[in-house]
Amino acid sequence: MIKKRKKKSYTSVYALGQYISMSAHKARRVIDQIRGRSYEEALMILELMPYRGCYPIFKLVYSAAANASHNKGFKETNLVISKAEVNQGNTVKKLKPRARGRSYPIKRSTCHITIVLEDISFYQQYEEYLMYLKKPGCRNENRNLTCYDTYSSGGLWDKK
């Protein structure tokens, strides 16, 4: 079996919430509203939506932004939610006691939520660099960047 290695992404940061006691369907309704939005806009949307599932997702988005600013030094104004997914977790099965010694099963569903934030300032800098390279005459100016004095140190290898 061939394993593919993931390339390290220098512009993305994630936060993962596991075993959140909420149905995956209800969490997806909230996640679909914030996917692709900026960080600050997503926080405003999550604060104003009237669903119970907004609070754990709000905490995850906030945690992902804290990871971005602390671990990688990104600014929160440049962050965008690039990927937000909800997966089904384990189902906790309980028994509820009923009359005459009977019991009814209760299924408590959980979900796993992943929030990935990307820094868009990196892409803007990259696009500016590409525009710079497309300008006429800029490639010829940058060709003479090698310093030949570093290669000719006067050692054994310079003798003919």
Swiss-Prot record:
The keyword Ribosomal protein applies. Its main location: plastid. One of its GO terms (cellular component) is large ribosomal subunit. It is found in: Plastid, Chloroplast. PANTHER family: CHLOROPLAST 50S RIBOSOMAL PROTEIN L22-RELATED (PTHR13501), LARGE RIBOSOMAL SUBUNIT PROTEIN UL22M (PTHR13501:SF10). Belongs to the universal ribosomal protein uL22 family. This is Large ribosomal subunit protein uL22c.
